[in-house]
Amino acid sequence: GDRKSLRVPKKPSRSLRKFLGSAPGVEVTDGKIRRLAKSLIKQEADAWSNVADIHKWVRGNVKFQAMAFRGAKFALEKKVGDCEDMTALFVALCRSSGIPSRTVWIEGHAYPEFYLEDGEGKGYWIPAQVAGPPWFGRMAEYRPILQKTDRLRDPIRRRFVRYVPQTARASGGAPRLSISRTMLTDEKPGAESQ
């Protein structure tokens, strides 16, 4: 279908609402992030064009630099960050505008996806690349996807984290730990998968 006919979900489902709030390093309610998001969204424009403007702004205004993760607020204030910071800023700007979005983790890299619906309410997770090739609406990435979210509850540390911890610690008794990775593929590129 026509990308320009896609729209922001009017009533996001419960499973989508988690992709509208803050997460570690994705400071959706920060005043500067909210003001920038408001300035980038044009009420008369279609959703695809609005998200494309967010994509262009992040790519054009935040310089890539390999560094430890500092988050969306840091990337906006300092205009510098690595793929995780740039992704966090894109995600925060989308979420602040009411557009569900999430971080996709692959080996050695992260990129954002945003969620739009067609006229019949069918939703699509759409990839974008904010650090690296300027892909928008497609992803020619060969590395396997490790995770598609940026707000998980760590049961050991009892707090929210950006991604699944790959380590654990135990005290007293014999530890029993199982970590599994399952490789999933979309049946159709852009199909909703959560």
Identify the meaning behind each predicted range.
Residues 3-78, 162-192:
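Secondary-structure boundary elements
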Residues 50-54, 79-94:
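Active-site nucleophilic cysteine motif
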Residues 85-166:
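Hydrophobic/aromatic-rich core segments of domains that either
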Residues 108, 192-193:
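Membrane-proximal bilayer-interacting regions
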